């Protein structure tokens, strides 16, 4: 079997993943390169990440997502590209990756070329929010950071009332991350009421960055 044809049935090597990452990092020079295969930028309480999921058929899939830095189990606005640019085979990568960058610029929201605007991110999250702790925590964090205390408090209360994931077996205890988010909502509510919301969020972020908190 031809070597390149055989490669179609295998995952990308570590070297190939680095090569893919280097191409896109060059297209986004102001973003930080994370060696596990991501490029990121941060603003206030959030991080925007472009990642490249390695697929089993010698290909990768670009995506973008917004993470909450004060509670990194929380993410929203996860997007893939259209069908034409969704899965990029390594044989096509050298001639196609620049077209993928253009597709990212046209399709990903919030824009990967404009500075991050927290109010725009908040509005985008509102359009897809569901009554689950992940989404409600994100909006509580964004509103608290922006000083929109009434809205933030409302989201904190909704965190406590959010139903548990429907896929949990009957009588199964809630997952650790669910309990973590509900506890976070209570502590954020207290910080807002004390006028210390931003300080609380910055402290929580620093604790994760120092490794004092774990997923």
Where does each model-flagged region fall?
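Intrinsically disordered, low-complexity regulatory regions enriched in serine/threonine/proline
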Residues: 2-9, 44-215
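Amphipathic alpha-helical segments
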Residues: 13-35
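Short, surface-exposed loop/strand segments
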Residues: 16, 42-45
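An N-terminal domain-cap segment
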Residues: 34-42
